[in-house]
């Protein structure tokens, strides 16, 4: 019997303190980044990715709703409207799982911790549907993914290659989970990733750390307005 002998699980901060870890004093040259990475958004080779803007993550009061969800929707719609008006492909990615979670693998174990049993993203369920205030259209492209990373187990890369896409604008929820893992995989597949920081949200407290990580190692971090300005400047 465990009784009162069960130990409290240490937090990451407590573990770091235990091994005397402190972050290194690293400075990233953002000015140099602007010089060497100015042309990541070529409009004719760019697509807009909108990741997991489903009711489960966006609807106020939902089990995994991002607190900044309403503001994120506004910024995503600005990008969607601009891209549609300028023939830039818009791709809506939706987490899609079996009702029993049998296709989720290891993710199913974590899901039991994160959300209640009735929050499975089964196709056609309320939580699975895109948030109704988004400006999606039937003529847009829709991709279903079974796990966090939108490239895993989906036809996303095949769609992008067939369209001749080289640069990807990332938006959606959660910044530090599905958006983040997809962006890193995109980088390793030699796509140029740009993330619209105000068009992404999260129910978790790690957005700032993920943003710094992306900006340092994987791609560019801009606002929706800055991305639109670059697209306008580079338009043929």
Residue ranges and their predicted role:
Residues 47-57:
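Acidic-leg catalytic submotif of subtilisin-like serine proteases
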Residues 64-68, 108-109, 187-188:
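Glycine-rich, phosphate-binding/catalytic loops in enzymes
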Residues 50, 91-94, 144-145:
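Short, conserved beta-strand edge motifs with alternating hydrophobic and charged residues
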Residues 44, 62-83, 87-92:
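A short alpha/beta connector and helix-capping loop motif
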Residues 56-59, 100-102:
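Short acidic/His/Gly/Ser-rich catalytic and metal-binding motifs that mark active-site loops
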Residues 20-26, 58-69:
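Acidic/histidine-rich helix-loop elements
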Residues 2-47, 78-86, 104, 111-236:
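Active-site-adjacent betaalpha module
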Residues 88-100, 196:
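Short beta-strand segments at enzyme active-site cores
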């Amino acid at each position: 019997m465990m009784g009162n002998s069960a130990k409290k699980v240490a937090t990451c901060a407590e573990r770091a303190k235990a091994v005397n870890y402190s972050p290194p004093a690293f400075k990233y040259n953002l000015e140099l980044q602007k010089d060497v990475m100015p042309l990541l958004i070529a409009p004719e080779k760019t697509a807009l990715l909108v990741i997991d803007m489903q009711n489960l993550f966006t609807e106020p009061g939902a089990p995994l709703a991002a607190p900044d969800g309403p503001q994120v929707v506004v910024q995503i719609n600005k990008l969607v409207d601009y891209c549609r008006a300028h023939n830039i492909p818009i791709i809506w990615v939706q987490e899609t799982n079996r009702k029993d979670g049998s296709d989720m693998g290891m993710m199913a174990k974590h899901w039991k911790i994160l959300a209640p049993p009735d929050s499975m993203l089964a196709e056609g369920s309320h939580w699975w549907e895109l948030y109704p205030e988004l400006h999606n259209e039937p003529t847009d492209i829709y991709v279903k993914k079974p796990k966090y990373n939108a490239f895993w187990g989906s036809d996303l890369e095949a769609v992008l290659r067939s369209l001749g896409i080289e640069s990807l604008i990332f938006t959606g929820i959660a910044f530090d989970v599905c958006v983040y893992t997809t962006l890193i995989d995109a980088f390793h597949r030699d796509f140029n990733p740009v993330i619209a920081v105000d068009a992404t949200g999260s129910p978790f407290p790690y957005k700032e750390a993920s943003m710094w990580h992306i900006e340092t190692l994987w791609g560019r971090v801009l606002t929706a307005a800055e991305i639109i300005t670059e697209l306008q400047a580079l338009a043929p």
